[in-house]
């Protein structure tokens, strides 16, 4: 990766920036103070090896913080900075959203005071993991110490412990909020904190976790090694995307998806289990129903043994209209190219959502949020990397779902809130439902809700209002109205 600066253990200088601001929420002016800084991690020899960069928002008119929650938030990847959740819905400034399927990736972009900001009820800490955003891997020889499921989680815990001591927040309620792979990070970090790390224990506990675009499963690594057909787990999302574009029914998306799931849980999964032993009558029934619910053609289903491949689905559902749908948001489309040029599976994702929004987020974050935070850092800001290509996926203690179960059983008051988009083809909500059915989680403390969105639930003014309201209620101890 090319950079315009080079860091070495003997020359790295930690950065720290402070600012003050005010925001009006529900008619009340709220003052806040921000501290953006490097959180340096040192090796056994005392030399700095890496830094996790944090952007902290403190409400400055609160004197006693013992009962004031702190929300620690990040994106996923692995290899993504916190830019998306920061500029998307958690900062005091955020993007102003327009239509979902915007035609151009170019400006003008609008950034506004965030009317839904959680600063009214909680302090907020946004986190750039090592090697992302302004986070830095200082010693390049130490990649294996940070770029892996457990390594990443322990680096986070190391920094959070130090941050909590530094700002005297040991008594404050603490919440994790992760998006996408950030859900994996949250579950593993909470599990390790409740039990034991590779070499040490941690003195931090979490009151709750918000999972946005869930990646916590009973499999080895998201969808790997799951004892169920992925076509069945993805089926409810396929139905949601088909409902949005092809309008097969007058039902609401919730009712249509619920009906599709009931079919997938019984007739469809049984047909896939039978395989070639299925009768012609049964096969016709399955072909008709699967095509109706998902929008995929009979011809495709016959060629693929009634199964649906995730990559193929994005090309198939609107094939007759000459369009492909986005992996990150099935509502967003682009022209369908020739098959030999289209997608080039596993090598190129020409994703319509990323095409439209990545530049928007970067412009908003670097052009507005950073100046407002008084961050003046002559360092490459890395929105995202390909660390996931080289990530250590080994989990010595079990699956991500097991880590979450460890945390919730050892911390009896801990709660979990899963938020998923009906049109998210990246982390399909069927996986979250499967996790909640098979992970042994305490059901009275686990909540799920679907949103009229894709992977990034906060895209769209209605969605960002709803999501922030639900998270606010969750932090205040109210149980979200679970749709699961």
Question: Which residues does each PLM region occupy?
Answer:
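N-terminal cap/lid subdomain of alpha/beta-hydrolase-fold enzymes
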Residues: 2-4, 46-145
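Alpha/beta-hydrolase active-site loop
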Residues: 119-120, 129, 146-166
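Catalytic histidine neighborhood in serine/cysteine hydrolases
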Residues: 440-456
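Catalytic histidine-centered segment of alpha/beta-hydrolase-like enzymes
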Residues: 454-464
């Amino acid at each position: 990766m090319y950079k315009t600066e080079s860091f070495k253990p003997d020359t790295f200088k930690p950065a720290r920036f402070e600012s003050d601001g005010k925001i009006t929420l529900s008619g009340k002016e709220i003052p806040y103070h921000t501290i953006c800084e490097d959180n340096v991690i040192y090796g056994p020899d005392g030399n700095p090896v890496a830094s996790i960069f944090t952007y902290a928002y403190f409400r400055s008119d609160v004197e006693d913080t013992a009962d004031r929650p702190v929300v620690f938030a990040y994106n996923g990847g692995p290899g993504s900075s916190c830019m998306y959740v920061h500029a998307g819905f958690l900062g005091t400034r955020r993007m102003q959203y327009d239509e979902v399927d915007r035609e151009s990736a170019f400006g003008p972009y609008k950034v506004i005071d965030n009317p839904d900001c959680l600063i009214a009820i909680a302090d907020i800490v946004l986190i750039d993991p090592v090697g992302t955003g302004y986070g830095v891997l200082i010693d390049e020889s130490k990649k294996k110490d940070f770029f892996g499921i457990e390594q990443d989680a322990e680096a986070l815990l190391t920094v959070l412990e130090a941050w909590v001591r530094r700002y005297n927040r040991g008594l404050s309620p603490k919440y994790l909020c992760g998006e996408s792979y950030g859900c994996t990070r949250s579950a593993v970090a909470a599990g390790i904190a409740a039990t034991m790390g590779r070499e040490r224990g941690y003195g931090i506990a979490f009151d709750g976790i918000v999972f946005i675009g869930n990646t916590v499963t009973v499999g080895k690594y998201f969808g790997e090694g799951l004892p169920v057909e992925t076509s069945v787990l993805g089926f409810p999302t396929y139905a949601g995307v088909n409902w949005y574009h092809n309008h097969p029914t007058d039902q609401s998306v919730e009712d249509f998806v619920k009906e599709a799931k009931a079919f997938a849980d019984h007739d469809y999964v049984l047909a896939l289990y039978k395989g070639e032993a299925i009768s012609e009558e049964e096969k016709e029934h399955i072909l008709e129903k699967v095509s109706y619910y998902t929008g995929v053609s009979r011809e495709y289903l016959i060629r693929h043994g009634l199964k649906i491949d995730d990559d193929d689905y994005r090309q198939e559902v609107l094939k007759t209209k000459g369009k492909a749908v986005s992996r990150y948001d099935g509502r967003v489309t682009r022209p369908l190219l020739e098959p030999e040029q289209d997608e080039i599976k596993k090598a190129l994702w020409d994703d319509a959502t990323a095409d439209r929004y990545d530049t928007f987020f970067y412009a908003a974050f670097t052009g507005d949020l950073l100046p407002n935070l008084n961050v003046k850092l002559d360092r490459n800001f890395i929105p995202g990397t390909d660390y996931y290509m080289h990530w250590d996926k080994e989990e010595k203690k079990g699956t991500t779902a097991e880590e979450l179960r460890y945390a919730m059983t050892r911390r009896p008051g801990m709660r979990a809130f899963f938020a998923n988009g009906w049109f998210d083809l990246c982390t399909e909500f069927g996986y979250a439902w499967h996790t909640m059915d098979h992970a042994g989680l305490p059901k009275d403390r686990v909540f799920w809700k679907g949103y009229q969105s894709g992977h990034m639930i906060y895209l769209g003014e209605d969605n960002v209002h709803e999501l922030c309201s639900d998270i606010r209620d969750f932090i205040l101890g109210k149980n979200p109205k679970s749709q699961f």
